[in-house]
From Swiss-Prot:
Disulfide bonds: none annotated. Keywords: Cytoplasm, DNA damage, DNA recombination, DNA repair, DNA-binding. This is Holliday junction branch migration complex subunit RuvA. The RuvA-RuvB-RuvC complex processes Holliday junction (HJ) DNA during genetic recombination and DNA repair, while the RuvA-RuvB complex plays an important role in the rescue of blocked DNA replication forks via replication fork reversal (RFR). RuvA specifically binds to HJ cruciform DNA, conferring on it an open structure. The RuvB hexamer acts as an ATP-dependent pump, pulling dsDNA into and through the RuvAB complex. HJ branch migration allows RuvC to scan DNA until it finds its consensus sequence, where it cleaves and resolves the cruciform DNA.
Length: 194
């Protein structure tokens, strides 16, 4: 999977972005939030990505922040929400506004998004209410700039058989305690001891 791409912007529209990486142009579908955060054409950028594979196409979705990507992935876990609907939701709501709407059971805010009716809004809240609190806590505990270390440690702990929610709490607590000044190896060792 492609975690992110870094290169120069060659084309930018409110829903699409083309980034030149080593002479190859990657086309990404983006939200309005990502569009607003990007600089002009020819500027260098780092875009977090999600590759969606279907029988007919391979589509890259791009996000300016790891938080936006995490919200996108959470939305994809909801029954009936595909990548196009998820990107539409993230175009209308920031990750923080989405998390707030889910935690406060605010169906009105979700229904304001084009294509989201009352049942879909209720389903999003029902299926994500437990997960978003964890994601929100994780994001507030996770020091900025440490996303790669955090994700790498979670992946390693998962492969070692540690339950995802336990690993998330443990890794976030260790990162908070060490204020981000820790290597991946030390983080994994401490998590296994804890």
């Amino acid at each position: 999977m492609i975690a992110y791409i870094q290169g120069s912007i060659t084309y930018k529209s409110p829903t699409q972005l083309i980034v030149d990486v080593g002479g190859i142009g990657y086309e990404l579908q983006i939200s309005l939030q990502t569009y607003d955060s990007l600089k002009d054409i020819a500027a260098s950028c780092k875009i977090f990505t999600y590759l969606h594979i279907t029988q007919d196409a391979h589509t890259l979705y791009g996000f300016s922040t790891i938080e936006e990507k995490q919200c996108f992935l959470q939305l994809l876990s909801v029954n009936g929400i595909g990548p196009r609907v998820a990107i539409t939701i993230l175009s209308a709501l920031t990750p923080e506004a989405l998390q707030q709407a889910i935690m406060t059971h605010d169906t009105i805010t979700l229904q304001a998004v084009k294509g989201i009716g009352q049942k879909a809004a209720q389903r999003i809240i029902l299926e994500l209410q437990g997960k978003v609190g964890k994601v929100g806590n994780m994001l507030s505990l996770q020091p900025s700039g440490q996303e790669a270390i955090y994700q790498e440690a979670l992946a390693a702990l998962s492969k070692l058989g540690i339950h995802k929610s336990t690993a998330e709490k443990t890794v976030a607590a260790i990162l908070k305690e060490h204020q981000g000044e820790i290597t991946v190896e030390s983080l994994i060792k401490l998590a296994l001891k804890g």
